[in-house]
From Swiss-Prot:
It comes from the Bacteria. Residues 197-200 are annotated as: Aspartate. GO terms for cellular component: cytoplasm. Keywords: Aminoacyl-tRNA synthetase, ATP-binding, Cytoplasm, Ligase, Nucleotide-binding, Protein biosynthesis. ATP binds at residues 219-221, 228, 478, 530-533. This is Aspartate--tRNA ligase.
């Protein structure tokens, strides 16, 4: 037997018991003829005692131990003299009677502690060492608990887990596919799925009325802190449902997770139309933990000789409560923030509403106190508040104000990661128009159904058609999205035509799918939740990388295994491939 207990298990009730433990040496220290060793495993840390006066040979062996050595010990549980309230085992320690080295270790390239000295690149290269850190390990434990709870919840609601193919055909729209050459079919390729969308709809047509899958998906796109080339979805589909049925089930799932994982009772989700989300927050994934909504004020700014406002399509403001004290330096920092190329605002205008009732603005030259008071009244500012104003093309300025709003929310401590604001964003547009390519694109995907009352607009004003689509947003993060699907053959063909797909193209790409509609497709809809983002939100993480065991870096590389890598000419030849420009 290698061990009788784990390093996080023993308590004062185990006093005087003989135990066997295994684990890694976290650290050791020598003091007055005693060697103290912190032994760590997945479950916690237990302190070991090697007393020189009791057993000199054992004491000398303990002196040889280095960080991350793997050892086995036998000993007696005793009450700890200097208790450590920071760890669950802090009331006890082990007086060691036997020590066995299972494997020595080289000196790790960084300290394996919560506050490590290892940079991102180094920790990614030695990810198996980084995973020993309590912080990363606890994130993966949280992930496991969430997946387990999700499966239990969906199973209790009659969902069936069904696996769908990983090697599929490439389809248009969305991000780029990862392509896999077929050795047995020269010149032909598979792609890795961006989602199981078509297959889960086919399962509905097949009669599996409640499906789910915790599934790997792949997108060859530029990476950010909330994106990875391979990611995990909780993918679900239901037959004979309307939008409200789906929202109810998955709002229930989210409440179940908050209750079982975090012990929190979450009230009902807010509902916000896409149009109102953009109008009041400048974003289709607003953080509703705090107010500071966008207010349009252009109509009360024009005609005063300030061309910047007069010539702008949109002038919008937010009110930062209690920020009238902001200094010139702080205002300059905000100006630099909004003018950063990633945001791209032309400038920042402010109105300071002091506690004495006086008004001060960066455009005093053009606007009277009466004018400024109208702005103050419009945004609902109080004495002591600061009004921040941006201007320009409407949609771009709303996006810029959204970024400024989030920045102010962070500065004012309004985005507490222990607080949660959950909502559904609904009534998305069905299409987006690309002015460069002169064509419509699906806002979500081509299989989303239009709202019944807007179907008549498909022929005349498709840009105004709303979709039976919805996104789940928590703390300004899009956790997932879904829709009611098209289940009518003729309507699906019409949507493809509006997207510019010819009949021959539609048949070659989606023939198998639309043909299935001819054989009794039920009304159906579904949702896909991003598991990585879900876990990161629960854990309060800024990046999803810290809740994925073996993530890629921002260049899409796994520096630990060296992927992607060059393959030999022989293997390329087997696949009938030639890499252009390869010397």
């Amino acid at each position: 037997m290698y061990r009788t207990n784990t390093c996080g298990e023993l308590r004062i009730v185990n006093e005087n018991q003989e135990v066997i433990l295994c684990g890694w040496v976290q650290k050791s220290r020598r003091m007055s003829g005693i060697v103290f060793v912190d032994l760590r495993d997945r479950y916690g840390i237990t302190q070991l005692i090697f007393n020189k006066k009791v057993n000199l040979a054992l004491y000398n062996k303990a002196l040889e131990l280095g960080r991350e050595w793997v050892i086995q010990i036998e000993g007696k549980v005793v009450k700890r003299f200097n208790k450590n309230s920071d760890i669950p085992t802090g009331d006890i320690e082990i007086i060691v009677s036997r020590l066995r080295t299972l494997n020595p270790s080289e000196v790790p390239p960084f300290t394996i502690e919560e506050n490590t000295d290892g940079g991102d690149d180094l920790r990614m290269k030695y990810r198996y060492l980084d995973l020993r850190r309590t912080l990363i390990r606890s994130n993966l434990e949280l992930r496991h608990q969430m997946v387990f709870a999700i499966r239990n919840y969906l199973n209790s609601h009659e969902f069936m887990e069904v696996e769908t193919p990983v090697l599929i055909n490439s389809t248009p729209e969305g991000a780029r596919d990862f392509i896999v050459p077929s050795r047995m079919n020269m010149g032909e390729f598979y792609s890795l799925p961006q989602s199981p969308q078509l297959f889960k709809q086919l399962l509905m047509i097949a009669g599996f009325d409640r499906y789910f899958q915790v599934v790997k998906c792949f997108r060859d796109e530029d990476l950010r802190t909330d994106r990875q080339p391979e990611f995990t979805q909780v993918d679900c589909e239901m037959s004979f449902v309307e939008q409200e049925d789906i929202l109810s089930i998955f709002e229930g799932l989210t409440k179940h997770l908050f209750k079982t994982i975090k012990g929190l009772d979450i009230s009902g989700f807010s509902r916000l139309s896409y149009a109102d989300a953009i109008r009041f927050y400048g974003s289709d994934k607003p953080d509703i933990r705090f107010g500071m909504q966008l207010v349009e004020i252009k109509d009360i700014t024009i005609g005063r000789g300030f061309d910047v406002f007069d010539e702008s399509e949109y002038v919008g403001a937010i009110c930062a409560e209690g920020c009238a004290f902001y200094t010139r330096k702080q205002l300059d920092e905000l100006t630099d923030f909004v003018k950063h190329p990633q945001i791209g605002a032309a400038g920042l205008i402010y109105v300071r509403y002091s506690f004495d009732g006086s008004l001060k603005s960066s455009v005093d030259k053009f606007y009277s106190t009466v004018d400024l008071q109208k702005w103050i009244d419009r945004v609902g500012a109080k004495q002591g508040d600061l009004v921040l104003i941006l201007y320009g093309e409407k949609r771009e300025t709303q996006k810029q104000l959204s970024r400024l709003r989030l920045e102010m929310g962070s500065r004012l401590g309004l985005r507490d990661k222990k607080q949660f604001g959950c909502l559904w964003v609904i009534d998305f547009p069905l299409f987006e128009y690309d002015n460069v390519l002169n064509r419509f694109f699906a806002k979500h995907h081509p299989f989303t159904s239009p709202k019944q009352e807007d179907v008549c607009l498909l022929e005349t004003n498709p840009e105004f058609v709303r979709a039976n689509a919805f996104d789940m947003v928590i703390n300004g993060i899009e956790i997932g999205g879904g829709s009611i699907r098209i289940h009518n053959y003729e309507l699906q063909k019409k949507i493809f035509a509006l997207l510019g797909f010819s009949e021959s193209y539609t048949q070659s790409q989606f023939g198998f799918f639309v043909d299935a509609f001819k054989y009794g497709a039920p009304p159906h809809g579904g949702i896909a939740l991003g598991l990585d983002r879900f876990v990161a939100t629960f854990a309060g993480l800024d990046s999803i990388r810290d809740c994925i065991a073996f993530p890629k870096n921002n260049s899409g590389r796994d520096t630990m295994v060296g992927a992607p890598s060059i393959i030999s000419r022989e293997r390329l030849s087997e696949l009938n491939l030639i890499v252009e420009g390869w010397q």
